[in-house]
Amino acid sequence: MLAVAVLAAGKGTRMKSNLPKVLQPLAGATLVERVLASARNLRPERRLLIVGHQAERVEQQLSAVDGLEFVLQQPQNGTGHAVQQLLDPLANFEGELLVLNGDVPLLRAETIDQLVSTHRSSGAQVTLLTARLDDPTGYGRVFADEQGAVSSIIEHRDCSEEQRRNNLTNAGIYCFNWTALAEVLPKLSTDNDQGELYLTDTVAMLTKAMHVEVADPDEVNGINNRQQLAQCETMLQERLRHHWMAEGVTFVDPASCTLSEGCQFGRDVVIEPQTHLRGRCQIGDESRLGPGSLIEDAELGRGVTVVMSVVREASVGDGVCIGPFAHLRPAAVIGNNCRIGNFVEVKKSTVGEASKVNHLSYIGDAELGASVNVGAGTITANYDGVNKHRTVIGDGSKTGANSVLVAPIQLGNKVTVAAGSTLTKNVPDGALALGRAKQLIKENWAGPQG
């Protein structure tokens, strides 16, 4: 059996934020959510999150995570003290305990799998993750033989000059035999410079220790300040882009684009510079996004073009052209082969197949049929100051430029609305609707003379 414990109680004072450090966002997810996800493939029987600073806020953020147990550490007195809080919740547990840090979000699932499998096959009481650093200053050094057996861990300040040449460091991630660990946890001492209980001290108390060296030291980078958060964002974005380029996606200027882990792309998608995808996005084959676009929690079909536009929580069919400077807001549903042009906003509306809203229009709380042509400057006036109302436009209808449709209103199929009309009443199929003042011409009118 396996239990996973994530240390998430720290204050993160160097972040200088009102938000708990483990809830800082990174490529569309919080730090601690990424850590929890990295161990998902192991299918642990128990998952425990050790909380402390702003515990209620952390618990609220993660309340939807199935099977996650919250354990309070109060006060926060070191990593050893944090794991001591598991003695009661895991009193009857037998198996391995994997200890992860809530502020180390780049750790790969494959690395964790290797750590746990090595621990199980070696018969060790503890297996720790290690990393070779170009500059190990300040890190505890791990001394081990060629078979991976750890003889000692010595803090940097206690190392001799020769020992400091060893750049194998402790990453602070462990897999323990829980029964063995539970016996030594009460023996931890605060006899150190910080007056805290260190989980590292348990390694010397256990009979057999092994280590697994991480292939990429960047995986175990911890985040303590905004600079490190930005560095991890850069590394994670590069990882995501490399993954999707290997799957057939083209990035014209990779470094200028950002993704979230929830994005999915078909083949031959092209992403132009300064394009950003957030949340859960589904992008169909041969679509072209950007330049200068934001797409968030949206579903786009095959062969969609989005140019300098914003698409949020919308569903877009195949072959749709969007932009430039269009805005699809939540609950916009655009049918196949539509055109949503420049300075058009669509909110909570359905636009039927092959319809065109080409210029300077607002479509809100509306239902447009197939092959509708919306003239430049057409507005669906959906709000009466208290309530929103719907506009329905039938198949094959067209509105002239600068028309206002005052909802609630329904236009039948193949209706024509004359330019400049303001309509307040329903229009039957095939009718021409005019709602404007009669044009007057006064000849020989020179106007006021100054």
Curated annotation (Swiss-Prot):
Write out the ranges of the annotated region (Linker): 227-247
Single Gene Ontology BP annotation: cell morphogenesis
Q: Which portions of the sequence form the region N-acetyltransferase?
A: 248-450
Instruction: Offer an example of a GO molecular function term for this protein.
Output: magnesium ion binding
Q: Which organism is it from?
A: Synechococcus sp. (strain RCC307)
Q: So what does this thing catalyse?
A: alpha-D-glucosamine 1-phosphate + acetyl-CoA = N-acetyl-alpha-D-glucosamine 1-phosphate + CoA + H(+); N-acetyl-alpha-D-glucosamine 1-phosphate + UTP + H(+) = UDP-N-acetyl-alpha-D-glucosamine + diphosphate
- Please tell me where Mg(2+) binds in this chain: D103, N224
Disulphide bridges, residue numbers: none
The Swiss-Prot or TrEMBL record lists the needed cofactor(s) as:
Mg(2+)
> Would you say which domain of life the source belongs to?
Bacteria
* Name assigned to this protein: Bifunctional protein GlmU
- Chain residue ranges for the region called Pyrophosphorylase: 1-226
- Annotated acetyl-CoA binding sites: A376, N382, Y383, A419, R436
Q: How does it assemble?
A: Homotrimer.
Residue numbers annotated as active site: H359 (proton acceptor)
EC class, as a word, reads transferase
Query: Where does this protein hold UDP-N-acetyl-alpha-D-glucosamine?
Result: 7-10, 21, 73, 78-79, 140, 155, 170, 224, 329, 347, 362, 373
As for subcellular location, the record says: Cytoplasm
- Its primary localisation, in coarse terms, equals cytoplasm
Q: Which gene encodes it?
A: glmU
Q: Which InterPro entries match?
A: Bifunctional_GlmU, GlmU-like, GlmU_C_LbH, Hexapep, MobA-like_NTP_Trfase, Nucleotide-diphossugar_trans, Trimer_LpxA-like_sf
Similarity field: In the N-terminal section; belongs to the N-acetylglucosamine-1-phosphate uridyltransferase family. In the C-terminal section; belongs to the transferase hexapeptide repeat family.
